[in-house]
Amino acid sequence: IMNIDVLSFARLAHRIFEEVGQSHRAVLDDEGKNLILRKIAGDYEKDLKVLKGNMKKLGYISEVKSVLSEFDQYDIGEEELRQMKVAAGENSRLYYKLQDLEVLYIGFKKYLEDRFITKEELLDALCRVVKGSDILKESTIVLDGFTGFTPVQNRLLGELLEVCREVIVTVTMDDRENPYVYKHPYQLFALGKHTVTSLIQIAAERKVSVEDPLCLYERPLYRFCDNSAMEFLERNIFRYSKECYKEKQGAVRIHVARNPREEAMKAAGRVRNLVRTKGYRYRDIGVIVSNMEV
């Protein structure tokens, strides 16, 4: 147990930088990004066509920051932005929004040069030093709780596959599904299948062997050991079968409301009742809605 470290990708990067003696620029957090973007927006205000009037609105800088962060995560640079502008066409409002984002992106990157590094760029810096790490050469890396990986994370995984003794990735999957066949993003367990097929492709490109999967499909699941109705629902929801649960149960209730307000009041009343009379805590309860704007 003493040899186990629980780390995020960012903390792993810092650990390896310390080992290999890699000096790197200070890592910029979200608040720092917001402050710098506010300055960039002021410096380039005259070049902004669509976003100029919005940059001073409450929370707008944070939204732009999130967009620029996703650009880094998904390998969208200046050239990709230009291609997106061409695809949008000069007659569309999207064209000028992308043009403003391009101005802010270039200004942001220019300001960071030789000063700071973002969390998104940290993993690219880690990719360049992975092969020099003795810690990683003797390590087993276990990735748990991920629904998928960004392109920069996939590049890092490719490096880790070549260097580490073993890389283990956990994926949520039903025993009736083929994890190696990804067809479209709307199929059941699409995120897990996309993760598996992407990792298989990365391993093939790096000429790394892939072991047979270890499938933990024991039934009944521990969380349903005293609730067969919920286990039946878990196995059959979104599957168009003719199976019916015929035993008496009280785990699933259906309430028909006349309008969204009545529906919300019923849910809130049920939550309050569970907390006051059944010993529940609010953190034990989840409310899932299809549309928060209704």
Region roles according to the model:
Residues V6, V50, V142, I168-V171, ...:
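A structural signal for short, well-ordered beta-strand segments and their strand-loop junctions
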Residues D29-D30, E79-L199, A203, E211, ...:
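Conserved helicase NTPase motor core
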Residues A10, T172-V181, L216-L221:
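Short beta-alpha junction loops
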Residues V130-G132, A204-V294:
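Helicase P-loop NTPase motor core
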Residues I1-I4, K137-E138, C164-V167, K248-V252, ...:
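Short glycine-/polar-rich loops that comprise or flank the Walker A/P-loop
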Residues G32-V50, V196-L216:
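Extended, charge-rich low-complexity interaction segments
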Residues I1-Q83, G89-S92:
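Conserved P-loop NTPase-based nucleic-acid remodeling module centered on helicase motor cores
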